[in-house]
Design a protein with these regions (language model features):
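Non-catalytic, solvent-exposed segments at the cell envelope interface
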Residues: 1-316
Length: 316
């Protein structure tokens, strides 16, 4: 395991950028992209999208090609985020699935479902954990995250503690300094999203909390876009840097409503149960809490605000 949070956490953010690009950018770009055809959507029922962040080092300066090195020839779903999209009410609900979760009757963590490179295995595991049907998935990587954040002109976040983590793209350390309302570029945002070891308690839960802050900033930035050139570039980055089974035409049609009702968009975010312990092999694991997940998903599926159902960790 790397000394810092597994790099896939950054991919969580890029995947969310991808979703938001589809929700916010299609409306303005539909007349400017020959390759994107909108499809009429008759029903506006809520649906679920799974955002998957791969921790593969391929394409980065940290890639060695050695099977003995972490996340070289295999990969893990180290960011797993379930998003409920409610087009009728202009609502997005973001639920983090802790990567160390172990489902009942299984011995491996849920992030191991991506080892063979099939995101549908991760989708299946999350469906079993949460009890909801997932319509689509989006999977992405490090460099895509950095490219999209840079294309957005950066994202503003509150940094609770100074962090220093290697940027996988360059293998060089990047420092993000504590402070409120800081605009981070792609490299800095990646570092902020990855940092875990710097926090004393509930390290991965704190990382998830930081990531949700980052993603909310990204969402608002994308939904508020007014430059056609920026939107077009974000869409190009989306298509080039993600793997997905999403019907972009249908999602684009729905996006027109979101774009026209930007001020009405409601964004909820929360974490799934993350309390865990060290197992016999010395690994941190989170045993799936079926009752807690059921309580959480009942609120999410009904369109309610799930924040606080699972208490957030203390701010570092």
């Amino acid at each position: 395991m790397a000394a810092y949070a597994v790099a896939g956490v950054a991919a969580f953010a890029i995947a969310f950028v991808a979703l938001c690009s589809a929700l916010g950018a299609f409306a303005d770009s539909q007349q400017h992209s020959d390759s994107l055809q909108l499809s009429v959507v008759e029903h506006k029922d809520p649906f679920y999208v799974l955002l998957i962040g791969s921790d593969s080092r391929k394409g980065t300066a940290l890639y060695t090609g050695k099977a003995s090195d972490h996340a070289q020839l295999d990969q893990h779903a180290d960011v797993i985020t379930l998003v409920r999209v409610d087009p009728a009410n202009y609502q997005l609900t973001l639920v983090t699935v802790p990567r160390d979760t172990v489902l009942p009757g299984e011995s491996s963590k849920i992030n191991d479902t991506l080892v063979h490179g099939d995101p549908m295995q991760t989708v299946d595991a999350v469906e079993r954990l949460t009890g909801v049907e997932i319509d689509y998935y989006l999977m992405t990587t490090f460099t895509a995250f950095e490219d999209l954040v840079d294309a957005l002109g950066g994202v503003a976040v509150d940094v609770p503690k100074t962090v220093k983590v290697p940027d996988p793209s360059t293998a060089e350390n990047v420092t993000v300094t504590k402070g409120d309302n800081q605009t981070l570029d792609g490299s800095e945002a990646l570092v902020f999203a990855r940092a875990r070891k710097e926090y004393v308690n509930d390290q991965d839960a704190v990382r998830q909390m930081n990531d949700r802050q980052l993603e909310q900033s990204i969402i608002r930035t994308v939904l508020g876009m007014s430059s056609e050139s920026e939107i077009d570039q974000a869409l190009i980055d989306l298509r080039n840097n993600t793997t997905s089974n999403m019907d972009m035409g249908k999602l684009g049609y729905l996006a027109m409503d979101f774009a026209m009702h930007e001020s009405d968009v409601v964004l909820y975010s929360c974490t799934g149960p993350y309390s865990g312990d060290v197992n016999g092999s010395g690994l941190w694991v989170v045993n799936a809490d079926a009752e807690a997940w059921e309580q959480l998903m009942d609120v999410v599926s009904s369109g309610g605000d799930p924040s606080g159902i699972v208490a957030e960790p203390a701010t570092p």
